[in-house]
């Protein structure tokens, strides 16, 4: 099965672990919002450092608005293959379709690296 229609670009495998690590570290040392609704609010308020969206969300309409909203608001965003892994990185026992890093805490250098890498993947467009 191909990627969901809302996945705007292919996240390289070597970038997935740093993204999940950034979420993991930021959730303990910074501030992270869990879930699609919280991520949406963070984008709209302009408080997100990085939005992380799972690629395996069913139905896809749940998160389909996030990449569009991120592009409109100039927010950095990235995709991870699994909502299960995203949930684990957030330190919760359930899946999470999306997350918003508001304060990276000790993960700031990882977030900066991810945002920079994503900008290059997207063709040099800067999101922040």
Swiss-Prot record:
Keywords: Cytoplasm, Ribonucleoprotein, Ribosomal protein, RNA-binding, rRNA-binding, tRNA processing. One of its GO terms (cellular component) is cytoplasm. The keyword Ribosomal protein applies. GO terms for molecular function: ribonuclease P activity; rRNA binding; structural constituent of ribosome. Pfam families: Ribosomal_L7Ae (PF01248). The keyword Heme does not apply. It comes from the Archaea. GO terms for biological process: translation; tRNA 5'-leader removal. It is found in: Cytoplasm. InterPro entries: eL8/uL1-like, Ribosomal_eL30-like_sf, Ribosomal_eL8/eL30/eS12/Gad45, Ribosomal_eL8/Nhp2, Ribosomal_eL8_arc. Belongs to the eukaryotic ribosomal protein eL8 family. Multifunctional RNA-binding protein that recognizes the K-turn motif in ribosomal RNA, the RNA component of RNase P, box H/ACA, box C/D and box C'/D' sRNAs. Part of the 50S ribosomal subunit. Probably part of the RNase P complex. NCBIfam families: eL8_ribo. This is Large ribosomal subunit protein eL8.
